[in-house]
Amino acid sequence: MHLSLARSAVLMLLLLFALGNFVVVQSGLITRDVDNGQLTDNRRNLQTEWNPLSLFMSRRSCNNSCQSHSDCASHCICTFRGCGAVNG
């Protein structure tokens, strides 16, 4: 039983990686408005935050410092260490 479950999990992971494209969405900040108590969404349009990922390593560098994903090249994302390749 456990072996079958493990095989299923491995198969699912292989299928995910075989697709080759994943989506990273930068989560934004949702706050409560002080005046009327309603929730406000301070995120930009999420469509602009999608970055396709690939299984293949990028040979381009991502050495910039950053505050947001828009500060990095298209193949990079902003991390706590600066711009980094989306696939590692």
Swiss-Prot record:
Leader peptide range in chain numbering: 1-27
Compartments, as annotated in UniProt: Secreted
Keyword hit for Zinc-finger: no
Principal location: secreted
Keyword terms, alphabetized: Amidation, Cleavage on pair of basic residues, Disulfide bond, Neurotoxin, Secreted, Signal, Toxin
Matches recorded under InterPro entries: Toxin_11 (IPR010012)
Record-listed Asparagine amide modification sites: 87
Disulphide linkage map: 62-76, 66-78, 72-83
TM region positions: none
Keyword Signal listed: yes
CC per GO annotation: extracellular region
Tissue specificity: Expressed by the venom duct.
Proregion positions: 28-58
Gene Ontology terms, MF aspect: toxin activity
Domain remark from Swiss-Prot or TrEMBL: The cysteine framework is IX (C-C-C-C-C-C).
Known function: Neurotoxin. In vivo, elicits 'spasmodic' symptomatology.
Protein family: Belongs to the conotoxin P superfamily.
Name used for this protein in its record: Conotoxin Gm9.1
Lineage of the organism: Eukaryota, Metazoa, Spiralia, Lophotrochozoa, Mollusca
